[in-house]
Amino acid sequence: MTKRVIYPGTFDPVTHGHSDIISRAANMFDHVVVGVAFSPSKKTMFSLEERMDMLVQATAHLNNVSVVGFSGLLVDLAKDQQANILVRGLRTTMDFEYELGLTTMYKKLMPELETIFLTPPEEHGFLSSTIVRETAIHGGKIDQFVHPYVASAIYQKVKQ
């Protein structure tokens, strides 16, 4: 039986922390579906298409990873993608508290959906999309935190 997992997020932008989780999940499972969330109420730096493109570039070396956009319920994406495992990253206890609430809700909506939590290596434990965006907006260098293609896209966006 093929094990397909979903790794959802906004990925605005995708960071080395996200890429680490994707790579590790790709080593553990047959196929990783990266679900890029779109919510009209959430203001993002990049459009859904731009975020998906950055993820495709950042994961091009992984042949068992696909990138899809979605809006609506994550459990609907899991059903559509025939995945019954959700992969989430945990950096802090605040992440854990937030994710625990979501996991409980997902179980109510889709009892067969299991959640696997992966913790980042020390060098990515502090990293978030918000930190990367804010650093770039204020003129800081972000190259060490994101894929080169992503860094270029961020620098271009900040110039606008």
Swiss-Prot record:
The record marks 18 as: Transition state stabilizer. It is found in: Cytoplasm. SUPFAM superfamilies: Nucleotidylyl transferase (SSF52374). GO terms for molecular function: ATP binding; pantetheine-phosphate adenylyltransferase activity. Its EC number is 2.7.7.3. GO terms for biological process: coenzyme A biosynthetic process. GO terms for cellular component: cytoplasm. Coiled coil: none annotated. Substrate binds at residues 10, 42, 74, 88. It comes from the Bacteria. ATP binds at residues 10-11, 18, 89-91, 99, 124-130. The keyword Cytoplasm applies. Pathway: Cofactor biosynthesis; coenzyme A biosynthesis; CoA from (R)-pantothenate: step 4/5. Keywords: ATP-binding, Coenzyme A biosynthesis, Cytoplasm, Magnesium, Nucleotide-binding, Nucleotidyltransferase, Transferase. InterPro entries: Cyt_trans-like, PPAT, Rossmann-like_a/b/a_fold. It catalyses: (R)-4'-phosphopantetheine + ATP + H(+) = 3'-dephospho-CoA + diphosphate. Pfam families: CTP_transf_like. The keyword Transcription does not apply. Reversibly transfers an adenylyl group from ATP to 4'-phosphopantetheine, yielding dephospho-CoA (dPCoA) and pyrophosphate. Homohexamer. This is Phosphopantetheine adenylyltransferase. The lineage of its organism: Bacteria, Pseudomonadati, Pseudomonadota, Gammaproteobacteria, Vibrionales. The gene is coaD.
